[in-house]
Every structure is written in structure tokens, then in C-alpha cells.
């Protein structure tokens, strides 16, 4: 049986971690592409030389030509400029749209059957642009945002309650930006609603304040990392999140992962890429799980969807 092939477009911080994680998990042979000569070659050589230590056995190749991604089963796109302190994700749209156009054309030509996961920011616009240019079915072009946003939300909750992150289930909806919707009502610890546990610890009034602070921190979590790094944006957690999506596709795991997916009426949204819970399997984004939202949650979702629509409308 032939091994799967994973193509990574963009050899920066996220791309390097993606290559390492894909190799460590032996998800398939890895091709790392970047326009900078020597960068992807150096990173893949470095990772490959760790194989005898870490015990993985896959092929790793760095390249500066799209032809080398030919026949890839999965393509993960990280290419684009990262944020700097004070920038929003949306500030990147003009320059990263040009980069995504070139990338999508390369994918269309050399990996026409791939499942494409976009990480590049502004995410909701970039995944839309990628699908438009490739012309791939919507179920084969998705964006990584919700897995990361939900993981950040879960981490903050685990730290606050002093429990294992493994026991926290958190859900976020909407766009990957300041208007994302962390769903408190659907968030739990071993099945126990998170607000019950916070109220046991703090009382109702204080619990509400603590949760509001965690929701705010989740929405600004990417910016928090940017402000601390000063020279770039997060790369470990986005890479881990995208690898979870790729693995679910390659192994047909049917995992339910918050994903930037194309909606066709779900959540009252039609014809737009928005973050929602999605079953990811061998068919790509196989189906959307519809959640019943209360009035407050729906209002937040509507606001987030409007922000995504406004952003996508700026695409040339």
C-alpha cells in the first residue's frame, strides 16, 4: 500500500512544525515548499536527521517548485505574512491574497485531488479565495481556526479549574477573529457544564466574571502570543491543530472538529465559509453538526458571520 503524501506550502515557523509533527506521527511522506531557496531544504534535512533518534520512517523533501507536490493527498497552506504587534488578522488581506492566488493555482495544477487545509490569515477570506481559485468541491477545502480557538478556550478553563486539559470539551463558532463565538453553554468538564463548576468555586456572580474574562482572552489569544513574541505569531498550536485535521482525513477517523467550512443553510448561513463543528473523514468535511443556539448565542453568531461577510467582500 502506497504511503500518503502531505504537501506543506510555506516553510516558515508553522510549516517547519507541521513537517516535524507529520513525520513524528508517520502520517505520510512530507514535501515542504517555500519560495526561499534553501529554507525548506534545510528544515526537512534537519528533521530527517532526527529520524534515527525519534524512530520515524518517512520521506522528507524540501522544494522551491510546485511540481514536487504532485499527487499530494493533503495540502496544508501556511504561506503568507504573519501578524506583528498591533495588527489584526484582517490587516493582512491585501498582501496575503496575492500570495494565496499563486499558491491555489499551484495546488490546482499539481494536486487536483487533495484535501486542502488553509491556515493563512485572514483565515476566513483566505480559505474562500483558495476554493474559488482551485474550483475544488467545498468539502475538500477547509480552514483551520476552530480547533485552535477551542483548544485555547479549553486550556484557559483547565488552568482556571485546576483540571486536566484532556477532560475539557470546548466549542467555538464563527470567524477566526475578534468576533469568534466561544460557546460557554456547550463547554464542559467530563460532561459537567463548566459554569456549574465555576459557580461551585466562586459563586454565581464571580463565576460569570471569570468566564467573561476567559472568553475575552480566547478571542485575543493569538494577539497575546504576537505581543509576547514581537517578531511573529503563534506556530506550535496552529500546527498541532492542522495536523489533527489532516490525521482525521487520512485515517478516516470521523472526528468532530471545529472547522472553517462552507455552509449551505446550516446555522442560518448560506454560501459562506464559517467556523462550525464538522465531521472530518475520508470524504473531507463530510457533514456539519447543527447546534441549537439560544437568542444570545445566535446574536453573537450573526455578528461574527457579518464580520466574515464584510471581510470576504473585500477580496478582489
Swiss-Prot record:
Q: Which CDD domains match?
A: LDH-like_MDH
Q: Give the reactions, separated by semicolons, that this protein catalyses.
A: (S)-malate + NAD(+) = oxaloacetate + NADH + H(+)
The record's annotation in Pfam families points to:
Ldh_1_C (PF02866), Ldh_1_N (PF00056)
* InterPro entries tied to this protein: L-lactate/malate_DH, Lactate/malate_DH_C, Lactate/malate_DH_N, Lactate_DH/Glyco_Ohase_4_C, Malate_DH_type3, NAD(P)-bd_dom_sf
Q: Which GO terms describe its molecular function?
A: L-lactate dehydrogenase activity; L-malate dehydrogenase (NAD+) activity
Question: Where does the chain bind substrate?
Answer: 83, 89, 121, 152
**Top EC category:** oxidoreductase
GO biological process per UniProt: lactate metabolic process; tricarboxylic acid cycle
State which Enzyme Commission number(s) the record gives: 1.1.1.37
Residues that hold NAD(+) according to the record? 10-15, 34, 96, 119-121
The answer to whether the entry has keyword Disulfide bond is no
Reply yes or no: does the keyword Oxidoreductase apply. Answer: yes
Chain's role: Catalyzes the reversible oxidation of malate to oxaloacetate.
Name of this chain's protein: Malate dehydrogenase 2
Source species, please?
Anaeromyxobacter dehalogenans (strain 2CP-C)
Amino acid at each position: 500500500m502506497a504511503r500518503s503524501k502531505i504537501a506543506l506550502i510555506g516553510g516558515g515557523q508553522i510549516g517547519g512544525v507541521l513537517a516535524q509533527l507529520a513525520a513524528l506521527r508517520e502520517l505520510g511522506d512530507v514535501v515542504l515548499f517555500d519560495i526561499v531557496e534553501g529554507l525548506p531544504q534545510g528544515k526537512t534535512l534537519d528533521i530527517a536527521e532526527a529520524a534515527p533518534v525519534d524512530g520515524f520512517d518517512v520521506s522528507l523533501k524540501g522544494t522551491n517548485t510546485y511540481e514536487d507536490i504532485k499527487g499530494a493527498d493533503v495540502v496544508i497552506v501556511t504561506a503568507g505574512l504573519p501578524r506583528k504587534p498591533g495588527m489584526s488578522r484582517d490587516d493582512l488581506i491585501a498582501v496575503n491574497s496575492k500570495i494565496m492566488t499563486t499558491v491555489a493555482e499551484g495546488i490546482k495544477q499539481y494536486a487536483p485531488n487533495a484535501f486542502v487545509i488553509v491556515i493563512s490569515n485572514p483565515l476566513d477570506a483566505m480559505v474562500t479565495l483558495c476554493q474559488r481559485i482551485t474550483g475544488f468541491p467545498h468539502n475538500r477545502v477547509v480552514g483551520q481556526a476552530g480547533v485552535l480557538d477551542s483548544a485555547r478556550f479549553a486550556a484557559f478553563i483547565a488552568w482556571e479549574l485546576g483540571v486536566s486539559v484532556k477532560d475539557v470539551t470546548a466549542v467555538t463558532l464563527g470567524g477566526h477573529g475578534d468576533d469568534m463565538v466561544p460557546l460557554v453553554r456547550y463547554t464542559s468538564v467530563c460532561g459537567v457544564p463548566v459554569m456549574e463548576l465555576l459557580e461551585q468555586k466562586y459563586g454565581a456572580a464571580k463565576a460569570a466574571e471569570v468566564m467573561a474574562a476567559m472568553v475575552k482572552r480566547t478571542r485575543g489569544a493569538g494577539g497575546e502570543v504576537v505581543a509576547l513574541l514581537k517578531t511573529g505569531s503563534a506556530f506550535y498550536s496552529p500546527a498541532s491543530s492542522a495536523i489533527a485535521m489532516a490525521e482525521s482525513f487520512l485515517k478516516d477517523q470521523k472526528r468532530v472538529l471545529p472547522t472553517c467550512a462552507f455552509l449551505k443553510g446550516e446555522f442560518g448561513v448560506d454560501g459562506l465559509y464559517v467556523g462550525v463543528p464538522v465531521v472530518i473523514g475520508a470524504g473531507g468535511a463530510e457533514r456539519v453538526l447543527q447546534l441549537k443556539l439560544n437568542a444570545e448565542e445566535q446574536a453573537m453568531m450573526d455578528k461574527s458571520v457579518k464580520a466574515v461577510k464584510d471581510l470576504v467582500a473585500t477580496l478582489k
